[in-house]
Amino acid sequence: MMKDNKIHCCLCGKEIDERESNNASPFKGRCCNECNVKKVIPTRYALSRKYALLFKAPTTYSEGGIDCITHPERLSLHDLQEKVDGYIEIIDLHNDYVLIINEEGRLYDLPTNVVWSKMEMSDLCVPLVGNVILMRKEQLK
């Protein structure tokens, strides 16, 4: 008889049977079917299509989420500032990607971006706050 192995979804925290969980890459860990469909698959698709991703920080009214930016090369400085709600700071991930965040996010006490913090490439010294844009270096003007 097989032992019942219960784990928690790495994205929403829901308890799931490990045998029915999904590989959540590019996020860390295993996820439930709902998060696989709503977050993991769209993220993989966007990264494979060279789209940029906007990881939205949680607010009073939402838990945060992920939006796809289909033509990141068309984004102006003003567009980037609008998406992160302030002045931008660029973080080089030392691979093909950069992050764009609100430079003053900590000063304004923006919430920790829990969705971004679950990405495999999120191993930075400090957790990021506010909205986070992940895009390829070549797409940045």
Positions of PLM-derived features:
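Cys/His-enriched microdomains
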Residues: I7-H8, G29-R30
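Short, cysteine/histidine-rich loop/knuckle motifs that typically chelate Zn2+
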Residues: C10-G13, E34
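Short linker/helix segments within small regulatory modules
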Residues: R19-G29
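Surface loops and adjacent helix of pleckstrin homology
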Residues: S21, R44-Y45, L93
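Short metal-binding segments enriched for Cys and/or His
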Residues: N36-S48
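Detector for the mature cores of small, proteolytically processed
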Residues: R49-K141
